[in-house]
């Protein structure tokens, strides 16, 4: 649970810090794919107005279908964001065998 709080704090910090750069409006997507039941797998989206949306993903496993299903959901979501006039400006990720974190930062065009 502490990990979720830290993640939300970081998303909030990135969104607030990035929003102070001139007239740029940022949208941040945090993808968490975890194998443990306590955290779960999900995408959290925070737009330039602070509006939050969460999209559930399948729990991380070694099954190819899980990776495929999650990748399709992530890809469709990123495409929808692009269709709304946002451009991807940064991506980072990390993790271990139990959890994968990926952050996408978009700027509104």
Predicted features along the sequence, with ranges:
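Solvent-exposed, well-ordered amphipathic alpha-helical segments
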Residues: 1-2, 85
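Terminus-proximal functional modules
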Residues: 10-109
């Amino acid at each position: 649970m502490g990990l979720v709080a830290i993640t939300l704090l970081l998303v909030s910090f990135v969104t607030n810090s990035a929003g102070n750069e001139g007239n740029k409006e940022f949208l941040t997507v945090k993808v968490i794919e975890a194998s443990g039941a306590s955290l779960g797998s999900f995408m959290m989206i925070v737009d330039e107005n602070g509006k939050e949306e969460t999209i559930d993903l399948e729990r991380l496993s070694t099954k190819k279908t899980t990776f495929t299903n999650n990748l399709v959901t992530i890809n469709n979501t990123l495409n929808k964001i692009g269709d709304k006039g946002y451009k991807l400006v940064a991506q980072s990720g990390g993790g271990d065998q139990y959890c994968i974190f990926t952050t996408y930062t978009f700027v509104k065009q």
